[in-house]
């Protein structure tokens, strides 16, 4: 009660306090005017998902001369990675890659945008008619050595692209192992 009495008398004693806050000399001011819609935007909390991770995305964990570890599963020998599956790929070297060996990539729906080919420890040239056949079907082909092909495949999958990979394990000493495999 006493506080209300003091405030009332203080308000009467100082006429400057009766003016609107925007006219007071010490009142904080914005350098720009916001419309009510702008004010509403600043009062809301928004969350934007920058990237949605798919639990079905393929990821190459590691590789060795014996094969690959894909999503924690070991695959021995050459393999073809499709958007949601892994299959054995019946080729021995890059010289065995033909139109027929690539046919599984153009029979899928949704259509694969790009196939990353890992040719072992070196980047090798594929036969021109094989590349031409893939181009005619609207599928891009990226030929790299297997270590770089694994990294490229992981990157493209992480971007959400519909990607396939045809990988031949690198011979000999080239290997990438995960920490879990190194502990075994």
Curated annotation (Swiss-Prot):
SUPFAM superfamilies from the UniProt entry: MTH938-like
InterPro entries noted in UniProt: MTH938-like_sf, NDUF3, NDUFAF3/AAMDC
Gene3D superfamilies for this protein: MTH938-like
Gene Ontology CC terms: mitochondrial inner membrane; nucleus
Keyword Mitochondrion attached: yes
Keywords: Membrane, Mitochondrion, Mitochondrion inner membrane, Nucleus
Localization in the cell: Nucleus; Mitochondrion inner membrane
Keyword Nucleus in record: yes
GO biological process: mitochondrial respiratory chain complex I assembly
Main location: nucleus
Functional description taken from the UniProt entry: Essential factor for the assembly of mitochondrial NADH:ubiquinone oxidoreductase complex (complex I).
Quaternary structure (record): Interacts with NDUFAF4, NDUFS2 and NDUFS3.
Sequence similarity: Belongs to the NDUFAF3 family.
Protein known as: NADH dehydrogenase [ubiquinone] 1 alpha subcomplex assembly factor 3
Organism: Bos taurus
Gene giving rise to this polypeptide: NDUFAF3
């Amino acid at each position: 009660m006493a506080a209300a009495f003091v405030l009332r008398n203080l308000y009467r004693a100082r006429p400057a306090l009766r003016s609107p806050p925007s006219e007071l000399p010490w009142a904080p001011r914005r350098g720009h005017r916001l419309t009510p819609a702008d004010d509403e935007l600043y009062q809301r909390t928004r969350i934007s998902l920058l990237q949605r991770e798919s639990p079905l995305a393929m990821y190459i964990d590691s590789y060795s001369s014996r094969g690959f570890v894909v999503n924690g599963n070991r695959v021995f020998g050459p393999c073809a990675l499709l958007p949601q599956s892994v299959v054995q790929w019946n080729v021995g070297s890059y010289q065995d890659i033909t139109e027929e060996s690539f046919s599984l990539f153009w029979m899928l729906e949704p259509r694969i945008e790009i196939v990353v080919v890992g040719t072992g420890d070196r980047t090798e040239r594929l036969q021109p008619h094989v590349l031409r056949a893939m181009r005619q079907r609207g599928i891009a082909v990226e030929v790299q050595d297997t270590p770089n092909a694994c990294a490229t495949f992981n990157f493209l999958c992480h971007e959400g692209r519909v990607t396939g990979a045809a990988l031949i394990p690198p011979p000999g000493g080239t290997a990438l192992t995960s920490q879990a495999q190194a502990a075994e």
